[in-house]
């Protein structure tokens, strides 16, 4: 028996932020935007037997992450932009090729993301204190005295 593997990865980001916060810190105005991003990894496996036709199976795993992006005066502050929460991964398999199952898998991941929307928003709202601590650390390093 031989296995034929094909892998692919797709990232799906939410267009609008799930939460935004305006923060004033050390006489600087910051804008923090929080978005969810889904990444789906596909792996197509075909078992091949000498006397039978191959049977493709699409195995997939999706990860849902809440990302923070921060800007000051319209410029991104890369030092504090990062993923702040990862949800438990979602995985499954579909009979057939990954190309044929892609729309079904994307719909399942979208339902998973919608079901976690309230939790993602709550995580983003609770991040304010963490972000302020990170900005304090950056400010302490940049203050000359």
Per-region residue spans from a language model:
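Sec-dependent N-terminal signal peptides
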Residues: 1-12
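N-terminal secretory signal peptides
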Residues: 12-78
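A generic structural signal for ordered alpha-helices
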Residues: 42-43, 48, 83, 98, ...
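A short, surface-exposed beta-strand/turn
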Residues: 75-96
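Compositionally biased, intrinsically disordered linkers/stalks adjacent to structured regions
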Residues: 91-145
């Amino acid at each position: 028996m031989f296995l034929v593997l094909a892998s692919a990865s797709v990232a799906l980001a939410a267009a609008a932020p799930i939460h935004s916060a305006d923060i004033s810190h050390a006489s600087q105005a910051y804008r923090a935007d929080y978005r969810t991003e889904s990444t789906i990894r596909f792996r197509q496996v075909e078992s091949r037997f000498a006397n039978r036709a191959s049977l493709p199976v699409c195995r997939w795993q999706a990860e849902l992450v809440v990302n923070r992006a921060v800007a000051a005066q319209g410029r991104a502050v890369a030092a504090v932009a990062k993923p702040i929460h990862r949800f438990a991964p979602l995985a499954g398999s579909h009979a057939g090729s990954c190309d044929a199952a892609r729309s079904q898998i994307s719909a399942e991941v979208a339902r998973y993301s919608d079901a976690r929307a309230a939790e993602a928003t709550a995580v983003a709202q609770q991040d304010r204190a963490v972000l302020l601590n990170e900005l304090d650390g950056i400010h302490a390093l940049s203050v000359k005295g």
